Curated annotation (Swiss-Prot):
Source organism (scientific name): Bartonella quintana (strain Toulouse) (Rochalimaea quintana)
GO biological process assignments: rRNA processing
InterPro entries for this protein: MetalPrtase_cat_dom_sf_prd (IPR023091), YbeY (IPR002036), YbeY_CS (IPR020549)
Annotated SUPFAM superfamilies: Metalloproteases ('zincins'), catalytic domain
Signal peptide: none
Cofactor remark from the record: Binds 1 zinc ion.
Function in brief: Single strand-specific metallo-endoribonuclease involved in late-stage 70S ribosome quality control and in maturation of the 3' terminus of the 16S rRNA.
PROSITE patterns listed in its UniProt record: UPF0054 (PS01306)
Family: Belongs to the endoribonuclease YbeY family.
UniProt protein name: Endoribonuclease YbeY
Length: 158
């Protein structure tokens, strides 16, 4: 079982129950898909706004702009490594996720779910630094999202 800790830092995120439900469903589906359903761990999510996300992105990645999701693993895992007692932290910026969903013709909840799955995979050691890593991570995202009845987020990008 994984304990989910959610902090809502922006009034733009106006439905904490919906955030918890989406996170729980995305987390369970991801962990089951990776055969990690028996892991005992904890994950923290911060739902914030673009202004705060830009500050965090500048501080930790030297990029002075907002982004959709940032992940900070508790341990430096490689893909396939067993996670520890703390998975890590995921931060999601509301305005960026809303804008991307509209631009890509997706529902907000589907895109948010994708960002949470993406963040969880980063916490579990998956990356997209190389072409091979990106292909592996995107394929996992497609498979997990399909189990959540969400269309391929990369279909129009391929």
């Amino acid at each position: 079982m994984i304990t989910i800790d959610i902090t809502v830092e922006s009034a733009r995120w106006n439905n904490e129950k919906m955030l918890y439900d989406i996170t729980e469903k995305a987390l369970k589906t991801t962990m089951n898909h990776l055969s990690l359903e028996n892991v005992v761990s904890e994950i923290s999510l911060l739902f914030t706004d673009d202004k705060h996300m830009a500050q965090i992105n500048a501080q930790w990645r030297n990029k002075n702009k907002s982004t959709n999701v940032l992940s900070f693993p508790a341990l430096p895992l490689k893909a396939g490594d067993p996670p520890g007692l703390m998975l890590g932290d995921i931060i999601i910026a509301q305005e960026t996720v809303v804008l991307e969903a509209k631009k890509e013709g997706k529902s907000f909840q589907d895109h948010l779910t994708h960002m949470i799955v993406h963040g969880i995979l980063h916490l579990l050691g998956y990356n997209h630094e190389t072409n091979d890593e990106a292909c592996q991570m995107e394929e996992l995202e497609r498979e997990i999202l399909l189990k959540l009845s969400i269309n391929d987020p990369y279909a129009e990008l391929s």
